[in-house]
Amino acid sequence: MMKSFFSAAALLLGLVAPSAVLAAPSLPGVPREVTRDLLRPVEERQSSCHTAANRACWAPGFDINTDYEVSTPNTGVTRTYTLTLTEVDNWLGPDGVVKQKVMLVNGDIFGPTITANWGDWIQVNVINNLRTNGTSIHWHGLHQKGTNMHDGANGVTECPIPPKGGSRIYRFRAQQYGTSWYHSHFSAQYGNGVVGTIVVNGPASVPYDIDLGVFPITDYYHKPADVLVEETMNGGPPPSDTVLFKGHGKNPQTGAGKFANVTLTPGKRHRLRIINTSTHDHFQLKLQNHTMTIIAADMVPVQAQTVDSLFLAVGQRYDVTIDANKSVGNYWFNATFGGGLACGASLNPHPAAVFRYQGAPNTLPTNIGTPAADANCMDLNNLTPVVSRSVPTSGFTPRPNNTLPVSLTLGGTPLFVWKVNGSSINVDWDKPIVDYVIAQNTSYPPQANVITVNSVNQWTYWLIENDPTGPFSIPHPMHLHGHDFLVVGRSPDQPAGVPQTRYRFNPATDMALLKSSNPVRRDVAMLPANGWLLIAFKSDNPGAWLFHCHIAWHVSGGLSVQYLERPNDLRNGFSQADKNQHNNNCNAWRAYWPTNPFPKIDSGLKVKKWVGEHPDWYIKN
């Protein structure tokens, strides 16, 4: 029995190898560069004070110090987009390897960048031309204040959009500004290509000259994500085959593919919008011979902080500035893995992009430079948001109703099952939680993992403990829909290379570790291995909001709860138009689902299984 446990633990850790301007869609099987022009706002604005010398100003009455949760520009503009999902078999990937199947958005493995100005409305028509998979698109990090039904979490805020031409419209306000991304919350679409980036233009905490645009970084696998999920439910997470930077990557075995290139203008300051769109891998990032200055974390503007390297967890975003003040030449932008294999691994020993100064020869850098410092799989916890928020730590007392233990069950079928508070989430696609809200039915299924929050405009505290009584624990990037949360505290960091010892929250000693005055605020934060994380958010946004690990294999395995915030206010706030669209989409899904002969094998929030010659083989429960 002990031998079986250690074998399972080794597998889990991976210690055992096993209306905007859109670019033209790529031809099937022909990879191309994924580029978007984000050097200017969507359109020139009249009398704008937002200049290279003064990025803090945005428009009369709105600047970097404006609290966007209180005041947002009323632009009167709606940005419209259409996203069409398709499947392609035997697709030639960017590293020269043919993949069995990919799912594309407007013909790309990265869909178009959704671009808007602060205060605009965004309207996206999603057309599902997949063969048998439903879909839902989540607009990661956008609060959806007053538009909970547009959050894109199937089984929670909507039924899936049925395949073979089903469609629905998402409409929401760009209340925040900064950098984010969108992705499927159904099936294997997240890992198989249904992903894209979001830019909401707005003020910044430091001046800069050039906006380089989005820079998504992702782990990349030759196997379909559906197959990988089944493998990780019964074994360890495999290393990625390579890492893609803005859609490009090198094959470490054959040399096929190419490095992504970013051009720097000598003497200028550049803004780079870095996004981790991975399914599993976290990255330690370093631009050789340069520093990066952080100006935003997860769409929260922060006071400038300069770093030599940067840890980026799955789902996180950082806006940074880079000064092109070095010798004209070519420099590696490296991604490494710290904190042991539980933090990520790749078969590519040198995942990198090339940052090239204008005037430099078109050659690869010759100096790999110094390795990035190992952050031990933990994110920065000392950033200072520009708009301050404070929370009284005296209001927190750990109790069973605000403590969420994360645990792993070993030895069943599947081998690994993730639980929060002793329960593994399993949503019902046919009856999302908002249906219960509309019907005033509070008999939620136990497996829906619903936590009801009835308080109004009050700080709510949540202590997440990582396997506090179990034998095994790894870090988790915890993501909350509908809110930014305050990182009030976490268990003490361990030095790099030193495994985290078991550390449960102890009020007698750990209350002194909590930060009440303007702590880090974001929507994805790392839960330390063997440790704890204390977050707080204010109950000011009625909705059904998922809180989950953003490692696709873990949320697929059940690591999620959903906060049902102020259900009565939520029900009263639904517009008739939203309810009509919701009902029409659910009716279309319910008509389709009984005709689909293929299985639902996981939580319903991420990936599903492909088997044999039937890549969408789902068994209905």
From Swiss-Prot:
GO terms for molecular function: copper ion binding; hydroquinone:oxygen oxidoreductase activity. Its EC number is 1.10.3.2. Its main location: secreted. The keyword Disulfide bond applies. It is found in: Secreted. GO terms for cellular component: extracellular region. It holds the Pfam family Cu-oxidase_2. Binds 4 Cu cations per monomer. Cu cation 3 binds at residues 185, 481, 548. Proteolytically processed at both its N-terminus and its C-terminus. It is an enzyme of class 1 (oxidoreductase). Keywords: Copper, Disulfide bond, Glycoprotein, Lignin degradation, Melanin biosynthesis, Metal-binding, Oxidoreductase, Repeat, Secreted, Signal. Cu cation 2 binds at residues 140, 183, 550. Monomer. Belongs to the multicopper oxidase family. PANTHER family: LACCASE, MULTI-COPPER OXIDASE. This is Laccase-2. The gene is LAC2.
